[in-house]
Amino acid sequence: MKNFLISLILLLVVCTAQLWGQANTLATVTGHVVDENKEPVPGATVVITNKSTGFSSGTLTSADGEYTIRQIPLGSPYSIEVSFVGYGNQTRSNYTLNQGDVLRVDFQLSESPVVIEEVQVVANSMKKKAANIGASTSVSARDIATMPVNGRNFTSLIDLSPLSDGNNLGGQLQSSTNYTIDGMTAKSAYSTGTSNRGPYSLSMEAIREFEVVTNSYDVTMGRAGGQKGEVMKKIIKLICFVLAVSMIAVIFCGCKGSGVVLATYDGGEVLSTDDDGQRTDDPYSVSQFGVTLSGAIVKDRLHYFIAWDQQYDSRPLEIADINGPEDEDRLGIKKETLDKFLQIARDQYGVSDSPQVGSFGKKRNSTSLMARFDWQLNPTNLLTVREIFNRDMDNHGTDDNSNINLYEVYGSNLSTDNSLLATLRTIVTPYATNELKVQYLYQMDHGFPNELLPSSNIPRAIVENVESAGSLQLGGQRFLPEQFKNHTVQAVNNFYWDTDKVDYTFGADVQVQYLNSLATSEMNGRFYYNGMEAFENNTPYRYAREVPVGDPTVKQTVLNSALYAQGKLGLFKGADLTVGLRGEYTYYFSNPEENPTLKQLMDISTANKVKGFQLQPRIQFSWDINDQHTDILRIGGGIIGSA
């Protein structure tokens, strides 16, 4: 028994140190209603209303006078009204709800009506965030507006987490980081990062709040920690991470009519240096501008929000731009050596007579568009439709890993993604709420060789041991051409049921991905030359190439699904225990091809079905000591990963 307790304590300590994420994109309001004698008032009506959008939701107090309203859209100003037969109505106003807030508002009813027009903001900001203290780092829209965020990329806000080193969290792989927007997947299906390779995948003006959640054990979140690795290797990890971005429905909360914001930024003269800090006379500019529109289409019923961001990036591409002895020292190569390499390349290897080294104009154009509509269908149903479109054209932005690559080596990449999301929030009963989300996500990455080369690419020549320069390269490159297309359909349904003793959550998350991939990395072949003389005599010492078997295009259909249930029990004042179970199932519809030679010689089959199932029990204890929102103890653990 003693060893079991020690093991359990160690497990909980380890689990709380790991990275897990939750995308609680909405807020919760809870409280206690009593009468003048401080006795509970059961059956009192509690209604919360957003005075800016007209959204409203309500519930009834329990036998103990407790009430909870879940899945409330973020924004302000909110008012809360309590009414009961025989007592005057009591109203409290001017509340702001941010991502993951659990706002507690208690009422004491009297015979006379009471209206509190303004709620003072106190210095203790833990009051609403007590449920997330120690679990997340939150950045509000106001913080975002005042922070000098470079490039207006919301993912750079991850650096505000104490667990971030700029590339990962807590020392984990970047591929373990999941990204969600409005609680639905926004992660690239092929690599790390978001679904778009551009400088940003969402206008900064469209972000209500950004949250880095690293220590929570809610069953509604999963499918992280590098889902592809887990499927293939069937590894169970205790490490996951989710970035949740929740977008504002109407960004000008409390304003009448429509709102318009114009944002511009231009960097030019002061930034005119290359990557090594050397001054360049070539045109250099990074211009960003955008517009946001918001307002009511039908007052208190239908509202819209539109955000558009555009970036024009014109920074020169510097390739061995030698204009004097200082450049030779900096680059580690003499101009005569470089000229000789170019002459041989043109005379014997067919390199174009157009410039291959120097300073080249390089342009990158990026567009981000978001539109959102919130429609209060009736007092019990809120429908939200949201569209995000991104396009990034990065010309000559893909190089290879030799020390000096000629201009013809540099390829381009076009990245496009489109996300259409519909959310329906329904009040089933005064004690039950259902939220259904359905998303279609399209992602396309198309990389293609330089305009000086054939579209199918050509082999490359790598000349090594060239003085102190290391290696020089001409021809094609390892990555291009490539093309990745991903169609994702995701449906998530969460049902919240509050009882006198336990708050239940039941849900399902189903995601189907259709992947079409053409990855030609290292398939074009490469010749290695030991020095300039061998290059001139065309005597390579090595040739290497990864040869595809058949069509290199890979088509896959993947099912990722999950069922989960959770109960939250109040133990005593300020303390609660949450216990949940999540089951994840992953299935690849297409089988790998059989290798008959391997099967015959070693009786090893390569045509095995790829699938996996994983049960993930989770538990968390939270104690707000004395219910003062100043001292909070949280212990949790569980299995977290992907099937």
Whereabouts are the PLM-identified features?
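Transmembrane beta-barrel wall of Gram-negative outer-membrane proteins
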Residues: 230-231, 282-393, 415-434, 438-440, ...
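Periplasmic N-terminal accessory/gating domains of Gram-negative outer-membrane beta-barrel systems
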Residues: 88, 94-106, 117-231, 258-278, ...
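Transmembrane beta-barrel strands of outer-membrane/channel proteins
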Residues: 123, 257-267, 306-310, 385-389, ...
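Structural signature of Gram-negative outer-membrane beta-barrels, strongest in the C-terminal barrel
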Residues: 61, 437-439, 486-488, 505, ...
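Periplasm-facing N-terminal accessory domains of Gram-negative outer-membrane beta-barrel systems
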Residues: 20-122, 129, 230
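Residue-level signature of outer-membrane beta-barrel architecture
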Residues: 214, 295-297, 375-377, 426, ...
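Outer-envelope beta-barrel architecture signal
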Residues: 177, 206, 257, 300-304, ...
